């Protein structure tokens, strides 16, 4: 559906992969869509992890963070399976991305840490503010179009490109696509952005969760 709408109706054409030469728009979209779906689905569903397990939270003494990390871990397994299927399709299309797999693992690890941090912050906040799920739904819809997932960033004016690059997910999407579709490494800028956002997200998420968690049982 994305391939039909954005390539044939809206005429978004990223061009062949550089230097891979691969020109399959559906695969190009999937390379950006899968990392985004992992982030969006994990944060959207993960924010309910504390509330949905309130019986456990109120009656059992344990580190509540384990609920979040356990959920994120389960989503990582799903993402790994989906990514493996995509990599299989890319191999069938002739893309020999195998030398880039170690860097792909690093990028996925950074994405996982970033996602875990955001999920921790959302889950802790959701206990106190239940309308957060609706606000976050709007944010993810805006975030989808504020990242080059279904369109090449080169189509945007320079000023708008700068704005899009401020979206944390842009670096992850671009890096995954560069590695397995274009067959080239991520830029130094994207690597720096991914590491900085991952560390910052986790620190903020853990800090907020630690501060808010003592009152979870009372609020629930």
Report residues per predicted region.
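Small-residue-enriched core segments of transmembrane alpha-helices in multipass membrane transport
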Residues: 1, 22-38, 102-117, 141-145
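Transmembrane helix-boundary elements of multi-pass transport/secretion proteins
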Residues: 1-41, 45, 187-188
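Alpha-helical transmembrane segments and their short interhelical loops
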Residues: 3-14, 64, 70-139, 184-207
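Hydrophobic alpha-helical transmembrane segments
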Residues: 19-22, 45-59, 80-89, 134-151
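Mid-bilayer segments of alpha-helical transmembrane spans in multi-pass integral membrane proteins
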Residues: 33-42, 46, 76-84, 112, ...
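Transmembrane helix boundary and interhelical loop/hinge segments in multi-pass membrane proteins
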Residues: 38-65, 69-76
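Short cytosolic juxtamembrane segments of multi-pass membrane proteins
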Residues: 131, 210-220
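Short hydrophobic, aromatic-rich alpha-helical segments embedded in or entering the lipid bilayer
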Residues: 142-192
